[in-house]
């Protein structure tokens, strides 16, 4: 392990992380068997023209390369034995899970606001079973992956994520997906407060809104909540001799 990697990466059995990933603000080390790759909300809603974000006025024109880099990160993770967790954000077709007027989600969700302005969109945006809710065609879960629905921005809220991670001895969460400044950051922050180490692969994420929001979210994460790296560094770190070494 790189001498500059955080000391917190010594697990209770005394092992150091076998993988050292170049990152900001410093290199970060982890063990593949104690790590998951989280793919946040790579649904048509967030990454495809004609999906919710596009219809709500957000620019999704740059998501193609992000999808390609997520596919690379997923392939690298699988090859290294890192489990992949997929999130899909949304609600039942009647939007009971969205919370109703008594929930701030009803007032702040741009999907719900778009449907109130355009009633013809009702039961089409982020509704389970719809094209909008589905993952993009280029990203497909495989047997052994974990696929979880989530009703709010954070993947920890009202989901079994925490218990599933703890049961598997997971300590490190590597994030990709959309939107960096909303669901990615919300989930990473909640993980930080549950003692998980969070890493974002910046070029495998995309913001909702202007580019300044991407920069701000990444700066916030690297300063206060985690580490920021990229897909090429992730691939290289996982393919190193030490990372491939089977623990005794």
Swiss-Prot record:
Hydrolyzes ureidoacrylate to form aminoacrylate and carbamate. The carbamate hydrolyzes spontaneously, thereby releasing one of the nitrogen atoms of the pyrimidine ring as ammonia and one of its carbon atoms as CO2. Its EC number is 3.5.1.110. HAMAP family: RutB. Belongs to the isochorismatase family. RutB subfamily. Keywords: Hydrolase. The lineage of its organism: Bacteria, Pseudomonadati, Pseudomonadota, Alphaproteobacteria, Hyphomicrobiales. The active site is at residues 41, 150, 183. One of its GO terms (biological process) is nitrogen utilization. InterPro entries: Isochorismatase-like_dom, Isochorismatase-like_hydrls, Isochorismatase-like_sf, RutB. GO terms for molecular function: hydrolase activity, acting on carbon-nitrogen (but not peptide) bonds, in linear amides. It catalyses: (Z)-3-ureidoacrylate + H2O + H(+) = (Z)-3-aminoacrylate + NH4(+) + CO2; (Z)-3-ureidoacrylate + H2O = (Z)-3-aminoacrylate + carbamate + H(+); (Z)-2-methylureidoacrylate + H2O + H(+) = (Z)-2-methylaminoacrylate + NH4(+) + CO2. NCBIfam families: RutB. SUPFAM superfamilies: Isochorismatase-like hydrolases. The keyword Cell inner membrane does not apply. This is Ureidoacrylate amidohydrolase RutB. The gene is rutB. It is an enzyme of class 3 (hydrolase). Pfam families: Isochorismatase. Transmembrane segments: none annotated.
């Amino acid at each position: 392990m790189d001498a500059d990697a955080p000391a917190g990466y010594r697990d209770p059995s005394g092992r150091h992380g076998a993988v050292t990933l170049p990152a900001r603000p410093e290199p970060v080390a982890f063990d593949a068997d104690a790590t998951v790759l989280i793919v946040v909300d790579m649904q048509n809603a967030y990454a495809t023209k004609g999906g919710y974000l596009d219809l709500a006025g957000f620019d999704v024109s740059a998501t193609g390369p992000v999808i390609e880099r997520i596919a690379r990160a997923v392939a690298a993770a699988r090859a290294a034995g890192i489990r992949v967790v997929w999130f899909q954000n949304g609600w039942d077709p009647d939007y009971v899970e969205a919370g109703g007027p008594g929930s701030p989600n009803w007032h702040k969700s741009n999907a719900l606001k778009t449907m109130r302005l355009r009633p013809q969109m009702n039961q089409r945006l982020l509704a389970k079973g719809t094209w909008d809710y589905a993952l993009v065609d280029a990203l497909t879960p495989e047997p052994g992956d974990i696929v979880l629905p989530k009703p709010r921005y954070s993947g920890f809220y009202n989901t079994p994520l925490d218990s599933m991670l703890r049961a598997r001895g997971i300590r490190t969460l590597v994030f990709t997906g959309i939107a960096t400044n909303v669901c990615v950051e919300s989930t990473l922050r909640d993980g930080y407060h549950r003692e998980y180490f969070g890493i974002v692969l910046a070029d495998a994420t995309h913001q909702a809104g202007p580019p300044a929001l991407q920069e701000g979210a990444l700066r916030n994460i690297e300063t206060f909540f985690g580490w920021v790296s990229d897909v090429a560094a992730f691939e290289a770190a996982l393919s190193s001799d030490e990372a491939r070494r089977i623990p005794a």
